[in-house]
Amino acid sequence: MENREVNWMKSGCKRRIELPEELLAEIVARLPFISITRFKSVCKGWRSLIESTYFRHLFVFAHRNSSSSWSLVCGTFGWSVEEMAGFYGCKRYGLPRRLGSYIPPHGLVDKHKIVACTDGLVLLQTVTKRETFSVGSPVLRQWVQLPPHPWKGISSSVLAIGLVTRVEDGVVMEYKVVCMDIDYRWEVESLILEIYSSLTGTWTRKKVRCPSLIVSLSYKRCLSLKKMLHWLDTHYRCRSSVGAIVAYDVYADDDEQQFRIIPFPDQKACFRRAYTTSGGFLVCINKIHLLLRLWRLEEYTSDSGRWQLTQEINLTSFGCDHHYFPVAMHPSETHITYMGNPEKALVSIDLKTHKLTLHTKSSAYRDTMVYHYLDTVYVSVEASFDHDVFYTPQFTLPTWMGSVPRSPSI
């Protein structure tokens, strides 16, 4: 094990101390991630140490009890984002400001449209004279511009809809960008997809068959989890169920195993739904009058998936009336749910402590994007759009942020 030199000031004298690399790594691994990244610019030796698997394991172990940073972003992505709720003051990353503020806003030199995000990566669509896609880490300020897909210009109906990652040992090893020909999303048995892989640096075009008819695919509400993309088919009907989740495994080798159509768990249609992730699972939140039900998708392998009812709560015990509507779940704390109220404010409910917290208290709140988003959702709720499913994107960070994966050809 090599020794490394550390300068130490004592009694006005500059002393040079040599520390074993193993001891030095253990000391540095206790620091927040944002501080560790500064050491990479000291010299090649520091960079090599910090980027090693050995150091990464030390860091993950040292911060095993620390929560990670996250944000709930209002609505579907677009030209700009605004954080509804989040947490950034963790010892693991040590970020000085809210995580949502790192996502490039509207008004940069190029026009950036935010398409998707997952595991600390963000997919941007740059709309100028020449449309391009970029994937990067806003926190690390690393961006990779993707090569143009060869079918650009052939069909104006091809849109980027999703970003999915392959994570190993807490590190993003690869990502794939998925585009869809949206002319083929109404009452279809197959979909036309264009997929870019950071491993190969190339685009592929493929036609994938669905196990049953897709009635109406909501491509804008795309959720990424466990190497899979999830969309909504709010008009799907199976027995007495209304609505389904369309799950697509981007990394599956067998075409027959790539698509799953999973009906929603509750049998009634006259309630408010939201779908999100929490604790590494896909979660469906159903509100029927004053009853709130939380369903967790346990497996995808069966024909219709397997849901488990994890919570059933009477909202009157929290002082909520029937005007409250589900919005999202805490990304990691499965006992915390977020709801909107008639004043278009966001509240969180801790199902363990029975504590209700108001998250929007500013006097200028009515001028924010969050207020207008919740107002739109509330109008939809009051209009009794029974089949609608609300989706609030989450921007979360993995246990360790490595460099953005890129093909050797880029």
UniProtKB/Swiss-Prot annotation:
InterPro entries: At3g26010-like, At3g26010-like_b-prop, F-box-like_dom_sf, F-box_dom. Keywords: Kelch repeat, Repeat. Kelch repeats lie at residues 177-227, 274-327. Residues 13-58 form the F-box domain. Gene3D superfamilies: 1.20.1280.50. The keyword Repeat applies. The keyword Repeat applies. This is Putative F-box/kelch-repeat protein At1g15680. It comes from Arabidopsis thaliana. The lineage of its organism: Eukaryota, Viridiplantae, Streptophyta, Embryophyta, Tracheophyta.
